[in-house]
């Protein structure tokens, strides 16, 4: 998101001021980082997270790494005194997530997680219809979601394997149900219980 905000001239605040993000890309593949930097005009990139976290001028750490790497990376950023903005899921387990929350609170930093799907055009329209009384009283809500992932034999797979392979730290349930939780909370009410079935069709 920061990349596109930079191209648009920064983030507009309510008083008309514009804030221009100065991102520092950190990843595992230097060739990809260099290509992204050149493509979007970002000069700062590194494969060394700890070195990047030492820069006092960078106050906010945004984590969009794979789920299995996230908890450790966020913990290192908290220890470096950075404010945290994090993709979901925050961690692979409730225990890890609660530990990160406790560490962030103890450090006295601001911390939050992505809730981007709340602002998808279709869901905003759904909320508008709900508020207008279009549906009447909702007694039951059902959401179905799936990834269409090309197998790679006839055409290249279009999603990285960690998005959907449990053994790579992903899986549609851990990757997506946390997003649908806040969608349901904000559109229809608090979730009281969950029943879930995940399958893979080839």
Regions found by a protein language model. Give the residues of each.
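Short, small-residue-biased leader/transition segments that mark boundaries at the very start
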Residues: 3-4
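Short active-site oxyanion
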Residues: 20-24, 59-61, 170-171
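N-terminal Rossmann-fold cofactor-binding loop
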Residues: 24-30
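Beta-loop-alpha module in the N-terminal Rossmann-like domain of NAD(P)-dependent dehydrogenases
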Residues: 31, 39-103
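Rossmann-fold dehydrogenase core element
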Residues: 99-116, 136-140
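Predominantly a Rossmann-like dinucleotide-binding segment in NAD(P)-dependent oxidoreductases
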Residues: 117-202
